[in-house]
Amino acid sequence: MARSFIMEAVMLAVHGQLLAPESPVEYIIPYTTILELYEMKDGSELIMPTPEDDAHVKNKIGELIAYFEDSFNKKKIEKALQMAWRKSPPLPINEYVTFTIIYAVENEEYGEVFDPIETELILTAIKEKSPLLTDQLDFLDKLIDAQIPIEVIDVEDFEFATEGDFLL
């Protein structure tokens, strides 16, 4: 059975190892984080610290956008967009990785401390009862400070998190 993780779409472009896990995983991705990919790809702001890494990641973002725009995948994603909190049918990537897109709705529940995308990630983790996978240490700190009742995993601990069942 696949282990589920909540995450932003851009994490797949930045952290290639997420597409090559040793056991099955399902990445539940809020739809608005897919929309962010367009801004990141075409924006002049650096995503990565060096121009070479930035160009590589922006190329990977372009590949992700093309994947999500593929007519077969686009139809599946559009099914999720028909109603709040609906999930798309699974989008298989390879033998071990499946994407599921969720039409998360930010309700300002955590709006004073967290931005809308962060709030969607939090609410999705709560609704899906799945851990949130992130590489943003400041977001991790805010989650801890606000005592948000979700499991959070730093991307550096991803391999450990996929090694069987455990409780944090």
Question: Where on the chain are the PLM-derived regions?
Answer:
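Short acidic DE-rich linear segments
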Residues: 166-168
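Active-site-proximal, substrate-binding regions of enzyme catalytic domains
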Residues: 2-128, 137-146, 151, 156-162
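Conserved SAM-binding loop
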Residues: 132-133
